[in-house]
Amino acid sequence: MGKAKFERNKPHVNVGTIGHVDHGKTTTTAALTKISADKGYGTKYIAYDEVAKASESQGRRDSTKILTIATSHVEYETENRHYAHVDCPGHADYVKNMITGAAQMDGAILVVSAVDGPMPQTREHILLARQVNVPSVVVFLNKCDLVEDEELLDLVELEVRELLSKYNYPGDDAPVIRGSAINAINGDPKWVAEFMKLYEALDSYIPEPVREVDKPFLLPVEDVFSITGRGTVATGRIERGIVKVGEEVQLVGYNAEKKTIVTGVEMFRKLLDEGQAGDNVGLLLRGVDKKDIERGMVLAKPNSIKPHTKFHSEVYVLTKEEGGRHTPFFKGYRPQFYFRTTDVTGTIELPEGMEMVMPGDNVQMTIELIIPIAMEEQLRFAIREGGRTVGAGVVTKILA
């Protein structure tokens, strides 16, 4: 048989397994690669031991370069899509991964043992998925071969659906597949058939993500300089969207509201007609003084993003071993919050009844910055003091 050709024409979707410890996330991940490989979709089977070997050495640095998170990355194909799949070895790795967005998820596969039903981490992972806005959750009830009573399975399924609804996922509509990952890996046709249903659920239920280039233009300003006789240039990496010569853009953040026209796009000292997501560019701006623009502002499609100062967030506080604080902090703590390219001072409010936050905790807190920053929900940030990173967070709700 010839080598299966890798087709790049299938849509690419990022997913991950979530759920309680020992409910079978890693075995499910291995099974997803095995059955896809057996079907001849050009996937490589990654056995349990390989998936479980996920270590910090192959872990992802998150985008804010705060933490190395132990994650295992595998890929597999279905008839319609190519999936990149992340599996984390430990609960703490999940918390860090989801808060920092190190491995983005367009959808999650919630693995629940049919023997135990939902457990504390099942809840916590659903809550985290909701907080960081994972758009959809597909449920895989694992170890169904160990439950003889069909009614017990119905009960577990009902419990999981209610839990999803509690955290504002459509619990009644979510696909729930009843399977056995280990038996599917061993080739038992009954359980392989259930994995075919799981692929189908992933393909039909998880919406195809909007590509970064199709989103409204945004560039965080890293540096600014003047070119005599030509004007002011702002440099940075385009976070999303496309910018073309002659288009209007808006400065946002630091109380700037100015709109301007892009008169030139430069990359590697060459002039381009346009720059797109991922490009490091210099944008020549009409009628803008060097003093009007500074690092920390963003250039964006007009009216696509607003400046804000106050928001709810989900935060992970680094442990001492991760280079974080050695001691707890209390309400009224005033660190710097690093957004995109700059530090801004702010104060924190802790949830009612919470006196202090210990290193290693993840906590919901309200933050108020001293100057407005271009912000939207799901924006990631770092918490720093004296140039040292002590926490990682995500904006969950904008207040002001």
Curated annotation (Swiss-Prot):
The keyword ATP-binding does not apply. Residues 87-90 are annotated as: G3. Residues 142-145 are annotated as: G4. It is an enzyme of class 3 (hydrolase). It catalyses: GTP + H2O = GDP + phosphate + H(+). Residues 19-26 are annotated as: G1. GTP binds at residues 19-26, 87-91, 142-145. It comes from the Bacteria. One of its GO terms (cellular component) is cytosol. Residues 180-182 are annotated as: G5. Residues 66-70 are annotated as: G2. It holds the Pfam family GTP_EFTU_D3. Its EC number is 3.6.5.3. Its main location: cytoplasm. Residues 10-210 form the tr-type G domain. Mg(2+) binds at T26. Gene3D superfamilies: P-loop containing nucleotide triphosphate hydrolases (3.40.50.300), Translation factors (2.40.30.10). Keywords: Cytoplasm, Elongation factor, GTP-binding, Hydrolase, Magnesium, Metal-binding, Nucleotide-binding, Protein biosynthesis. It is found in: Cytoplasm. GO terms for molecular function: GTP binding; GTPase activity; translation elongation factor activity. Belongs to the TRAFAC class translation factor GTPase superfamily. Classic translation factor GTPase family. EF-Tu/EF-1A subfamily. Monomer. GTP hydrolase that promotes the GTP-dependent binding of aminoacyl-tRNA to the A-site of ribosomes during protein biosynthesis. This is Elongation factor Tu. It comes from Gemmatimonas aurantiaca (strain DSM 14586 / JCM 11422 / NBRC 100505 / T-27). The gene is tuf.
